[in-house]
């Protein structure tokens, strides 16, 4: 297992791969160094990317179905009576985050929402929890229904809005993505899209084995179903 934060980390990781003669690599970071993936392909090491943009030939990808998740979020907020919407994400974003935002915009538009007028892109100066908290402080008029790119942003936004005296779902509704353990805690009770980590892991290992058996096969992308978990910040609507 390796974490790469610098060019030195990248060089060290590549040396370790050569030293231990690894038989396969799974890249899980939201923004993994492309040089690492390309070098593995060059050395004929099978690579599977998880939740990353499918762009490199000879690499297989396993991704949560971000577009379907965004549609579930749009449907939930519309059924709940929301008419003004917000999208919260960092800039620059991971590929998965960008895909979720673009799909959310499309889903609203195809359901009759004027996205030029009724969809706000909320400013998020930093990543993670702190970024969500800052976005809440910077937000002017708060949209009725907000979709967040990930759970950390959503939790930070919830706490930031509490500091402004606003609560979900009384003052606005909020849906996150990831369903990490903190989202189920009593203080958050975040309605969120659930990524099936076990299914993603199984598919990644299967693709790795298949790539090792047939290195020249075309690249494939597997989309893993996501589900909407209803909690307090956007309750279930019949």
Describe the residue ranges of each PLM region.
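Alpha-helical recognition/docking segments in bacterial nutrient-uptake
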Residues: 1-75, 135-141
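Periplasmic-binding protein-like
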Residues: 14, 21-29, 84-89, 121-122, ...
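Residue-level detector of anion-binding/catalytic polar loops
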Residues: 23, 46, 83, 114, ...
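Residue-level signal for nonpolar/aromatic packing positions in well-ordered secondary structure
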Residues: 25, 47, 76-77, 104, ...
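Anion (oxyanion) recognition and catalysis
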Residues: 41, 109, 162
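Glycine-rich phosphate/diphosphate-binding loops that line cofactor/substrate pockets in enzymes
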Residues: 74-85
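Flexible loop/turn connectors
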Residues: 116, 134-238
